């Protein structure tokens, strides 16, 4: 469990976590080496942090990479990372929005939906889940939709 805030990343809040890291995401990621059996779930507090972590995660051999967020945010982040030179092929394994569609609304329900997807993936129980099929089948359309995204329009890339 990683968070850049001590108030969230601590043993009191996550007593069962194998490891709790409270430092900047990039510094934390520099110490991690996910393997082919690793699961990476990206749930940060902002688009920029999500993008920073996803940039790293898609370049690892992790078995599962999931990211919370809307389709619009995901499309904008994928576009930005593609502009940086990351192959669109790497995004095919990203589950976004993360979690099975169970109509979750509350934080607890969202946690259940995410956990259910992780279990399904671990147990090879995946069926045709639409996680990113909408992105790959409508990539041109999705790029147009993302034009107005706050992630797509920043001072660095305007």
Model-derived regions, located:
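Structural motif
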Residues: 38-39, 64
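Conserved SAM-binding strand-loop segment of SAM-dependent methyltransferases
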Residues: 17-24
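Short glycine-rich anion-binding loops that position phosphate/pyrophosphate groups of nucleotides
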Residues: 45-48, 70-72
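Rossmann-fold NAD(P) dinucleotide-binding segment
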Residues: 49-62
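Short amphipathic alpha-helical segments
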Residues: 13-14, 33, 52-55, 78-80
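Short amphipathic alpha-helix with an adjacent loop that forms part of the alpha/beta core around
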Residues: 25-36
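Adenosine-phosphate binding glycine-rich loop
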Residues: 62, 68-158
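NAD(P)-binding Rossmann-fold cofactor-contacting core
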Residues: 1-15
């Amino acid at each position: 469990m990683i968070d850049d805030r001590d108030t969230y990343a601590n043993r009191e809040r996550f007593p069962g976590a194998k490891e709790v890291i409270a430092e900047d995401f990039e510094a934390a990621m520099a110490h991690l080496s996910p393997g082919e059996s690793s699961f990476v779930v990206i749930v940060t507090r902002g688009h920029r942090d999500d993008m920073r972590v996803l940039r790293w995660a898609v370049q690892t051999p992790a078995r599962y990479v999931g990211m919370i967020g809307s389709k619009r945010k995901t499309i904008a982040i994928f576009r930005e990372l593609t502009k940086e030179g990351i192959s669109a092929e790497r995004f095919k394994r990203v589950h976004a929005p993360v979690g099975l569609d169970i109509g979750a609304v509350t934080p607890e329900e969202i946690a259940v939906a995410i956990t259910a997807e992780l279990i399904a993936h671990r147990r090879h129980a995946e069926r045709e889940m639409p996680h990113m099929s909408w992105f790959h089948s409508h990539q041109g359309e999705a790029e147009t939709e993302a034009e107005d995204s706050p992630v797509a329009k920043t001072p660095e890339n305007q």
